[in-house]
Amino acid sequence: MADHSEVDSVSGTATTGHAWDGIKELNTPLPRWWVITFYITIVWAIGYWIVYPAWPTITSNTKGLFGYSSRADVAVELANLEKIRGDKMAALATASLADIEKDPQMLALARAKGKTVFGDNCAACHGTGAAGAKGFPNLNDDDWLWGGSLEQIQQTLLYGVRSGHPKTREGQMLAFGKDGTLKPAEIITVANYVRSLSGLPTRQGYDAAAGAKIFAENCVACHGDNAKGNPEVGAPNLTDKIWLYGSDEATLIETITNGRAGVMPAWEGRLDPTTIKAMAVYVHSLGGGK
């Protein structure tokens, strides 16, 4: 490798003095426009550091000479938005559920607000489309454990189910096997009887009369003589082919043996009353509201 520079005979540009396998490196200067632009960006960066928030400090950050804050801009925009919505939200806060249903504009506002709140607070369990999952009800159908009227939905949202709230909805599926109320063979029989109520196939040799007898003695108090359930205690309809935990025999045996006691949180105290009202309207509008 050479230790001195020379001028390239073709380009007239000096070399760096380096050569690799006969290939020499030209010392071509940067274009003047590029150098000027580079220096301008340095000056611009220094100016930006001075006039805008830029450098973090131990407790905050430098504020800059302009005192600009994008968060402050957002706060102003949100305040303006709240001002625009203020009258409508105030009307929504004082309106009854029946009044909201009668007013198309108020109904649209409640649905829009309720949809947003649902996505933030309810979708984790019920799904973004409110179709539910195992143990979490589908809110699009017309099957309601605790009633599907606007008032009933609002009450469920306010106080929850087995949530610990003083006004929570109480009621649970008893553990007939775990408590020793029914024997394993009886549980299998009544599980098949429950399947038959929805037209599902039953185990070969299943005794329908015995299943009906066990059901009448142990289940009618909550689910009713016709097995159509009771929203007063959260007992589901067993004849509509809608299943919260599953309709297969093994799942029904598990349910009857160990019971079910799902929990829904109470939203009173977490969300303001107007927001809960809007969420009730939204859930009611999903298609299954009564």
Curated annotation (Swiss-Prot):
State the signal peptide span. none
Recorded family membership? Belongs to the CcoP / FixP family.
Cellular component aspect of the GO annotation: plasma membrane
Which organism's genome codes for this protein?
Answer: Bradyrhizobium sp. (strain ORS 278)
Q: In which pathway does it act?
A: Energy metabolism; oxidative phosphorylation
The Cytochrome c domain is annotated at 109-198, 206-287
GO BP terms, alphabetized: oxidative phosphorylation; proton transmembrane transport
Q: What does this protein do?
A: C-type cytochrome. Part of the cbb3-type cytochrome c oxidase complex. FixP subunit is required for transferring electrons from donor cytochrome c via its heme groups to FixO subunit. From there, electrons are shuttled to the catalytic binuclear center of FixN subunit where oxygen reduction takes place. The complex also functions as a proton pump.
Record protein name field: Cbb3-type cytochrome c oxidase subunit FixP
